[in-house]
Amino acid sequence: MPLFTLPAVTIQSAKAMNELHYRITRRVSECISHANLTLNTEFSAPAIRFDIRGKTAGMALLQRWQLRFNPVLLAENPDAFIEEVVPHEVSHLIVFARFGRVRPHGKEWQSVMSQVFDVQPKTTHSFDIKSVEGKTFPYHCECDVIPLSVRRHNKVQRQQVQYVCRRCKQPLVWKPSSP
């Protein structure tokens, strides 16, 4: 009896992910090269990882000169990743290198997005996140049922925080369902 089981990954899906990783890596290189040409700089290509989980599409680790991407959202939205997420994250690195610590989506970042990469500077993605959404707990108020994440639910249970409804301003209460 095996101690663990491997996920069912087909050769075709592995090849598809390798192709997507290659496309992302190539797009990152193109963005860096374009920024170097446009801004007369010599930025090196960042390290790239595909290990983010949850709802986050991408992340720039500024001091490490590293980009991280969500492989699930990438597989579900490859074209949008290449056209929007990669320039978004590369812009964070460029802004950090040129201006230091500034507001993450401030005027410097917006300028790099629009003037260097010719991409609309959106701060969030609009991908369907059903496949990466975690478990939620139904909390009730006087006007609605509001799902809270595991993290927020645990904070409520430890009495570290109490959430209130934005509409009716009443406290959110968890009513566990009976078995």
Residue spans of the language-model regions?
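Active-site recognition of the HExxH zinc-binding catalytic motif
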Residues: E84-F96
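Metalloprotease/metallohydrolase-associated module, dominated by Zn2+-dependent proteases
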Residues: P2-A80, F99-P179
